[in-house]
């Protein structure tokens, strides 16, 4: 983990879904840094070296005693986008972090530490890989999926993504392109409160458990709502899945 305070400047912001924005930052400081895991060679100037799934901790203000308020955000962009990083945030009314980000303008700087975190892909997988996300928990999952699809591994790569309504959807073109390029990848998007007709209705937990008997040596990566993670994790363990060897998770709180 890099504990050194670094800076980046906002270069783009776009609305991707209802109350959900993508923020793109250019790394400002030219010093090389090392990721939280050993990853080989040093970074070159203005690069942020990280593994898909890791996060950064951002100073979003100060409390009443003048102490910094820190919030953690997963990196949504792949490492190949050298010199920049993107974050996908659901803006929550009254949230300290949301208020900070909503006030950012092009060229504004943020201070952060990282990258850090252990919610990353295993170095290899013998069987199927199942990613389960809710809401903006998809942010670190997408680059993780891209990483494993570049490997010559035998198993299927499956994504189950749960959202509330159609207005919460984003990234459909990217997911469709991944499906078209990689026959072993399949994406299933479920809406729990669709406003109109939608084929895949309900929460993601049930469909994942229904699929479990057909999976071969699966590894599960769970990211998003903490309640979903705990419920699904408990159900998987009850069905013989190893918590230590087969389940990785990262809780998000919108």
Each predicted region: which residue ranges?
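A short, basic/flexible loop-to-alpha-helix module at the beginning of a structural domain
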Residues: 114-125
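Phosphate- and divalent-cation-binding pockets in alpha/beta enzyme and binding domains
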Residues: 120, 140-143, 231-232
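Histidine-anchored nucleotide/phosphate-binding helix
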Residues: 138-150
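Ferredoxin-reductase
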Residues: 2-106
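Reductase modules of NAD(P)H-dependent flavoproteins
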Residues: 2-4, 160-254
